[in-house]
Amino acid sequence: MRLLILALLGICSLTAYIVEGVGSEVSDKRTCVSLTTQRLPVSRIKTYTITEGSLRAVIFITKRGLKVCADPQATWVRDVVRSMDRKSNTRNNMIQTKPTGTQQSTNTAVTLTG
């Protein structure tokens, strides 16, 4: 009997875990509730994302892992985003550039006749 009750309790718990938010709106974990007006130094920012929704915002993720929401229309926010994009483009260009000039073939196959 105890095993049956324990099994039913486990099934109910599992069902509640799997079916989260049925009949209700599940909020997005990337939603901002307020925006900061305090400038963040570019050197402390690791990356950013832009959210759309009831409150449009730029979410800066600092090198320490903190998430800071800022107004995308603010001048300092646009400057930081531009700076981050420039860094990203520079990094991507360095990765994608191919060396110029000719390289010697690495094919070392030898044909023996005889």
Swiss-Prot record:
Pfam families on file: IL8
Matches recorded under PANTHER family: CYTOKINE SCM-1 BETA-RELATED, SMALL INDUCIBLE CYTOKINE A
GO molecular function, one term: chemokine activity
Family: Belongs to the intercrine gamma family.
Protein purpose: Chemotactic activity for lymphocytes but not for monocytes or neutrophils. In thymus, mediates medullary accumulation of thymic dendritic cells and contributes to regulatoy T cell development, playing a role in self-tolerance establishment.
Gene Ontology cellular component terms for the protein in this record: extracellular region; extracellular space
GO BP field: antimicrobial humoral immune response mediated by antimicrobial peptide; cell chemotaxis; cell-cell signaling; cellular response to interleukin-4; cellular response to transforming growth factor beta stimulus; chemokine-mediated signaling pathway; inflammatory response; mature natural killer cell chemotaxis
Keyword Signal: yes
Disulfide bonds: 32-69
Gene: XCL1
SMART domains membership: SCY (SM00199)
UniProt entry keywords in alphabetical sequence: Chemotaxis, Cytokine, Disulfide bond, Secreted, Signal
Predominant cellular place of this UniProt entry's protein: secreted
Secretion signal span: 1-21
The protein's name in its UniProt record: Lymphotactin
Keyword Disulfide bond part of the UniProt annotation: yes
Region Disordered, residue ranges: 91-114
InterPro entries xrefs: Chemokine_b/g/d (IPR039809), Chemokine_IL8-like_dom (IPR001811), Chemokine_XCL1/XCL2 (IPR008105), Interleukin_8-like_sf (IPR036048)
Expression sites (tissue/organ): Highest level in spleen, lower in peripheral leukocytes and very low levels in lung, colon and small intestine.
Subcellular location: Secreted
Domain of life according to the entry: Eukaryota
